[in-house]
């Protein structure tokens, strides 16, 4: 009875007919073969990967055309050295240390290896060879951006080719010719009222902030002023404040993914891998939206439709169309966006660096203030021409640009056409650069290279301490055909902002803050501040 009861409540089980012995053996053999096939495929894949890894290491160490270029072992066989440098946000300093190590005896090398496909030079000779068309250009060999990470990202991010991303020399020359009228001496004079307007607004902004708290971070005030100046010159009106915040967030994101981008840079040199590299960049959607999200095309169209007398970049550029120098609407948007983003970031960075250096060197700050007070009775008297003739003001700016070049990141990289650079043959396709940060701090070219010495720019005659400085090695705006087209605008804006700030306020440092120690640098300088007692 008990067994019957238990059986009646047993769970239902489907019926399966019994297998005979031959069927069982056949299934067992098949499962065994499937398992062997799976494990065999896995073993083959692992073996292939191991062989590929070993061969890659062996090739990069012994067979690569740049195998003799000295550098850390990890840099010779992988992108990990560069990935580490940008990840820890010490790219400039780390490259400089490499040059100091391998530039000494017995190596005495003008070039170091940063990755399996990238090398860095630290000599004026290399800088001229890479950026100035010379003997190699006469042979039809040009250093271009084709194959660089910047060019690859430019194709994906920007709506059309611009001055930064153009890889063909003729195309770059056409765009430069179309944009050049916006940066002539006459254009600068006509644009000055826009700079004056936003500089005066900066002074009022700092005055208001100092009423609430005597310690003021000057960086956001200076950054906003430069953003307003550059965007006003580019679009005929300042862009919204939230667009500046959006750009700063995107810049931070870009630097955060820089280690991944370094790995992709190595992929660019592998045949057939460029498509994969571009697809990987596409996985970072924020980078796609940079020009159109920060600088909407609707705002550009609105500027085209508006007829006014304000003199800005677009006024001069549109005049070129009348002379037959053509740019498409997409090229106009791409280049206008470029002028705002690059013009803003480099100028804002240099402003903050200069003010920080002045705060750290109160004697220099006092000398500058005395110079300004001796030449002007008020800030309303300050105009671009007399400011450009002040030795201490211009010395402070040039010295800041020497110590902290704003555009030293990957933007100076080029692809070798296969030629000699400073006595070293660099094969075609290798990524090359002349490291601006290292050159401008090299004892080979500068007396007291790591010190802030504004007087080196005006007190440098025969017999002086700085007489032997090689000032031709100072190229913060690059050199050659790709020299920054907006350098005069940037310098004019910096002179005006610094002069009015130093003239108006008695500034004093409130912390021991050093750019060398505290400011992150990967592809760009980020996270800087400038706290001062006002």
Swiss-Prot record:
GO terms for molecular function: heme binding; iron ion binding; monooxygenase activity; oxidoreductase activity, acting on paired donors, with incorporation or reduction of molecular oxygen. GO terms for biological process: terpenoid biosynthetic process. It is a single-pass membrane protein. This is Cytochrome P450 monooxygenase btcB. Heme binds at residue 484. It comes from Colletotrichum orbiculare (strain 104-T / ATCC 96160 / CBS 514.97 / LARS 414 / MAFF 240422) (Cucumber anthracnose fungus). PANTHER family: CYTOCHROME P450 (PTHR24305), P450, PUTATIVE (EUROFUNG)-RELATED (PTHR24305:SF162). Its EC number is 1.-.-.-. The chain crosses the membrane at residues 41-61. Gene3D superfamilies: Cytochrome P450. Pathway: Secondary metabolite biosynthesis; terpenoid biosynthesis. Pfam families: p450. Belongs to the cytochrome P450 family. One of its GO terms (cellular component) is membrane. Its cofactor is heme. Cytochrome P4590 monooxygenase part of the gene cluster that mediates the biosynthesis of betaestacins. The bifunctional terpene synthase btcA converts isopentenyl diphosphate (IPP) and dimethylallyl diphosphate (DMAPP) into the sesterterpene betaestacin I. The C-terminal prenyltransferase (PT) domain of btcA catalyzes formation of GFPP, whereas the N-terminal terpene cyclase (TC) domain catalyzes the cyclization of GFPP into betaestacin I. InterPro entries: Cyt_P450, Cyt_P450_E_grp-I, Cyt_P450_sf, Cytochrome_P450_monoxygenase.
